[in-house]
Amino acid sequence: LALIWTALDVLRPRAPGLGKASRRLLLLLGLVFLTAMSGGFVAGLDAGMTYNTFPLMDGDLIPEGYLVYDPAWKSLFEDITTVQFNHRLLATLTGVAVIAGAVLLMRQTTDPIARRGLIVSKLLVITQYLLGIATLLSVVAISLATLHQATALLLMTALLFSAHAVRPSR
C-alpha cells in the first residue's frame, strides 16, 4: 500500500484537499485491512469449510461455541466458529461503513478522481460481500475464494486512491 501511495505521489501532484476526508478514508482502509486479516484466519483455519449457511450459522445468529476456548482470547485466533463469526461481523460492518462513508464523502469533494475512487469502492465492497457469501455457500470453491481475496486488494487500492486524491496540501 505504501508503494501505491508513493507511485500516486509521483503521478499526481498535490492538490488542495480535504484533510478530514483523507483521514476518514484511511480509517475505512484500516477497517478493510482488519477485515482482510480476519479473512486470513478464516482461510488459515479452513473455517469456510464449516457453517456453510448464510446469514445464520447453522440456524443461529450467534453460533453455539462462540468464544469457547479458555482463555477466551485464544478463540479469536484458533477457534473455527469464532473466527468465521468475527469475519462475518467485520465484513458486514465494513460493508456498511464503506458505503456510508463513500456516500458522505462524495458530498464533500468535487475532485473527479476521488469521486471515481469512491464509486469504485462502493461497487467493490458490494462485490466483495457477495463473493464472500458465494465462497461460503460453495464450501470454498477455489476460484471464488481467490477472487474474494483479489477483490479485497482492489478495494484497499480504491480507498487508498481516493484518500490520496483528497489528501491535504503540505
Identify the meaning behind each predicted range.
Residues 1-170:
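Polytopic transmembrane helical bundles with strong interfacial aromatic enrichment
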